[in-house]
Amino acid sequence: MSKLILAINAGSSSLKFQLIRMPEEELVTKGLVERIGLKDSIFTIEVDGEKVKTVQDIKDHVEAVDIMLDAFKKHNIINDINDIDGTGHRVVHGGEKFPESAAITDEVEKEIEELSELAPLHNPANLMGIRAFRKLLPNIPHVAIFDTAFHQTMPEKAYLYSLPYHYYKDYGIRKYGFHGTSHKFVSQRAAEMLDKPIEDLRIISCHIGNGASIAAIDGGKSIDTSMGFTPLAGVTMGTRSGNIDPALIPFIMEKTGKTAEQVLEILNKESGLLGLSGTSSDLRDLSEEAESGKARSQMALDVFASKIHKYIGSYAARMHGVDVIVFTAGIGENSVEIRAKVLEGLEFMGVYWDPKKNENLQRGKEGFINYPHSPVKVVVIPTDEESMIARDVMTYGGLK
């Protein structure tokens, strides 16, 4: 018997939703509420492939959910709100408390709130969505799916920082990692495409979008990942610096007179591709600029690819080899150029990739880009975090 599951991603003033029929993983509709709590909020829903947009004031997330449910009935997507069988909520930080997704109870809600100090921008916003759905749909299971949960299998040697140990014990300072739902989805899909048990595979997953992280997945479990205590760590990103020498922060403060908060803002929002190029955080813009001879744009692309390339080598060493390299997310799925730069020179590791196949895979296409004889397979997989969320609602919401 099919179930209708809502996959939800709530921001402080936004609410993204997808209604998915399970277990078929068929998208029924999707949409977005923007500018919640502001004047002229925008509600967009997809009906028969067309976007239907309305502008009205929406005061809070409860009203946003109410409007969404009304739209479902108005457009005959559902007959009654009781047709919805469960909801799944993306929650950015689950800390060490949540090594897997969890059915939401009052206790779980309280624990998500307590973890807000680890994700002050995201967890409170995710909670707004959870509370709105629990209020309006009280009789169905609601499940929290944590970005950090997949990486809770990392061993101590991967997640501990070389700081006084009591900082970890007292304040929870350690590597947590993010994009877990995406890494989990593409690693499972890669195993399906290879027709091999995931337990037998060593996978390096490259989630490369405006935010980017690399994960080492051994036997289906994350054993290391590039992001850290926050999503600022790791590789160069659209506007984030990735790893830097921590002593740079007081040095920049001294040289510029900026506060620690201001420097952190620069590292999060003015660095990465944007900071290096001085023009854009968008890879497409930088590729065009590089082609027209802008040296700084080319340099930004080279730095970006080089950091990812380095992590692949590092994680191959961590797993004593690699069987599959996966590219996913906006840049990973679409940038022929970045994939080529990242893979360049990896033949010593058994990576032999086909430039023609690489050229053909973009705009949501899935497939292998390695030569048949390549010991290491290279695959492009469009990520689908919403389907992963819906799967977890079925499992943890007791709907299977």
Swiss-Prot record:
Q: Cofactors per UniProt?
A: Mg(2+); Mn(2+)
- Database matches in Pfam families: Acetate_kinase
Q: So where does substrate get bound?
A: R90
| Lineage: superkingdom | Bacteria
| Enzyme class per UniProt | transferase
Cited SUPFAM superfamilies: Actin-like ATPase domain
Q: Where is this site: Transition state stabilizer?
A: H179, R240
Under Gene Ontology molecular function, one entry of this record is:
magnesium ion binding
List of catalytic residues? D147
> Which biological pathway?
Metabolic intermediate biosynthesis; acetyl-CoA biosynthesis; acetyl-CoA from acetate: step 1/2
Keyword Chaperone (UniProt): no
Instruction: Tell me the residue numbers annotated for binding ATP.
Output: K16, H207, I208, G209, N210, G211, D282, L283, R284, G330, I331, G332, E333, N334
Q: What is its EC number?
A: 2.7.2.1
Co-factor remark: Mg(2+). Can also accept Mn(2+).
Binding residue positions for Mg(2+) = N9, E385
Q: Which family does it belong to?
A: Belongs to the acetokinase family.
Function statement: Catalyzes the formation of acetyl phosphate from acetate and ATP. Can also catalyze the reverse reaction.
Q: What is this protein called?
A: Acetate kinase
Q: What organism is recorded for this protein?
A: Staphylococcus aureus (strain MRSA252)
Supply the source organism's classification: Bacteria, Bacillati, Bacillota, Bacilli, Bacillales
Write the gene name: ackA
